Amino acid sequence: MLPWFKNWFNSPYYHHLYFNRDEKEAAEFINKLIDHLHPLQGSRMLDVACGKGRHSLQLSGKGFDVTGIDLSEDSIKEALQYETETLHFYQHDMRLPCWINFFDYAFNFFTSFGYFNTQRENDNSIRTIAQSLKPKGIFVLDYLNVHYAEDHMVHQSEKEIDGVNFLITKWYDEQHFFKKIMIEDEQLKEPLVFTEKVSKFSLGDFTDMFAYQGMQIKEVFGDYNFKNYHVKKSPRLVMIAEKIK
């Protein structure tokens, strides 16, 4: 049986549901992040879990050499339309090694982590990213803030997008957040159901995972405007780490 994310991320309904999700906010966050980091022109950047490549394209347009990787073959096929001499895309599983000491920066945006069943798989993913960075390379991971997500969870919601109905149910246990999505479409004989599962990783968890792979967190922010991180009040957990080994 395939893991949930392989089926869901390759589903046309996934892209239908999330296509326009906060794109303006995402683009503004990336602009502010680049202003904060001050990368040199031509810096090599790795966009981990790049999806269809829209954010990789934005980074490339700022004068950087960008490589995007994603597990979804369909997403990468679509991203390939943007390829240039300084923008590259590959279908790749972040749990498996790739480049070694190659990139100046690596990014994992918008909670594109924490999907795997075992801690070994999570550690392997962080290892892949750490190994891909040059010494002193920078890794930015943007994750949900567990405590905020618990306190502000909307347990039931419904969305209608272009005639497709999405019934969304959210809950959590001690280790994971769950999101069940029931899809009703006239073209379907019966509703489709997908369930997302994301690990409840704290700042302490990431600190340990990064340290194990030779990276150290240097800065932490609590939203896309780079406000200070507050364990209960911040909607996001944005970590900037440096490869120190």
Set out the residue ranges of the language-model regions:
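A short glycine-rich, Lys/Arg-flanked "PGG" loop and its adjoining helix->strand segment in the class I
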Residues: 123-135
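A short SAM/SAH-binding and catalytic strip from SAM-dependent methyltransferases
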Residues: 104-120
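Conserved class I S-adenosyl-L-methionine
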Residues: 1-40, 42-49
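A short acidic, Gly/Pro-enriched loop at the edge of an enzyme's catalytic core
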Residues: 95-106
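Class I SAM-dependent methyltransferase SAM/SAH-binding core
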Residues: 54-96
